Amino acid sequence: MLSPKRTKFRHQHRGRIKGISSRGNRICFGRFALQALEPVWITSGQIEAGRRAITRYARRGVKIWIRIFPDKPIRTRPAEIRMGSGKAKGSPEYWVSVVKPGRILYEISGVSETIARAAFQIVAYKMPIHTKFITSLRK
């Protein structure tokens, strides 16, 4: 699963997901892409599950680009600790990627549109949000 090798700070504020994605919202590498339609935190496990689904379905000849990276640490309160007293004090439990609407999640090339559409249908089922299949204009 994806996670940063090192970070400048150990903890991060949770923050709010406002607005739409102004970066990473166009197809840059592949021919077909999966685009997010809602704001969400996507965990490294969900990203990896999507990658595995594409490689299993599309088999040989597919090239995959993962356009998101989990760089936000999420901490949870340890077991048997009383509620309250500020933020969760534990070490990072898992990593998430902050995704705004319009962000490209995955891109693929080297397969036909029907195979790409079917592969992304499986991936979309594993994502916690509504997504959209889009095609690059260039051939």
Curated annotation (Swiss-Prot):
Main location: plastid
Keyword Ribonucleoprotein found: yes
GO molecular function, a single term: structural constituent of ribosome
Pfam families: Ribosomal_L16
Superkingdom of the organism of origin: Eukaryota
CDD domains in the cross-refs: Ribosomal_L16_L10e (cd01433)
GO biological process, one term: mitochondrial translation
Localization (cell): Plastid, Chloroplast
The entry's keywords: Chloroplast, Plastid, Ribonucleoprotein, Ribosomal protein
Subunit structure: Part of the 50S ribosomal subunit.
Protein name: Large ribosomal subunit protein uL16c
Organism placement in taxonomy: Eukaryota, Viridiplantae, Streptophyta, Embryophyta, Tracheophyta
